Amino acid sequence: MARICLSLNRLKVAVIPVLALLAAGCGDSRSAKAPPLAENEASRIVPALDPVGMPRLRDSTLFELSYPAAELKGGSVKLHAGEWKDSLTPDNLREAYLTMVAHGDLNGDSLRDAVVILYTDPGSTRKFFRLIPVIASTTKEPEMLGGTVGYGAFLGDRVKPESLWIDGHRVWLRMVEPAKGDDPCCPTLWQQRTYRLVRDSLKLETTIPLGNHD
């Protein structure tokens, strides 16, 4: 029976959630597969300004960038409409896509940056998640920001990100990761992490255990 493992963020900064991260039985090698953000959000029109009236990176910009992915050939992946599939492999087994996006100021320049979670499947039982910053910059169009992809943080294999937001120039993440003795497919350790941007890289700042997650 599938479990819904992805919750909506209810805190201060608006977050664009994906639908649900489905975890099938422990014997399913694709149990940590998350639905693509673009696939579920493609019909939604996201305003260029967030509620406080400050310009932010458009999701359409984030969906077309290249992101680091060490387990894929070349070490990076160029997304189109928020996802990528390797058409040269049988059944498109290798793929990558965004599963979460949050907006907020990471470096104190009053521009709304973004942070994304990238899911990659290299065509094996292992499924990887990365937390990656996208640093906003001004363009000739006042309400259109450019984005530079920074260096992210590796979250792990078959972890379950649940909520993501930016507040106080920090990235906040709640996720479930394997505890000691867990089967890789079925993590139970619930944690809250904070990251801060140092130049163009995300650095882990705090980790707070939240207990076991059913």
Predicted regions and their residues:
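C-terminal motif of bacterial Sec signal peptides marking the signal peptidase cleavage site
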Residues: 22-25
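Bacterial N-terminal signal peptides that target proteins for export
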Residues: 2-15
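C-terminal active-site/capping subdomain that shapes the small-molecule cofactor and substrate pocket
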Residues: 18
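Beta-propeller-forming repeat regions
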Residues: 27-106, 111-214
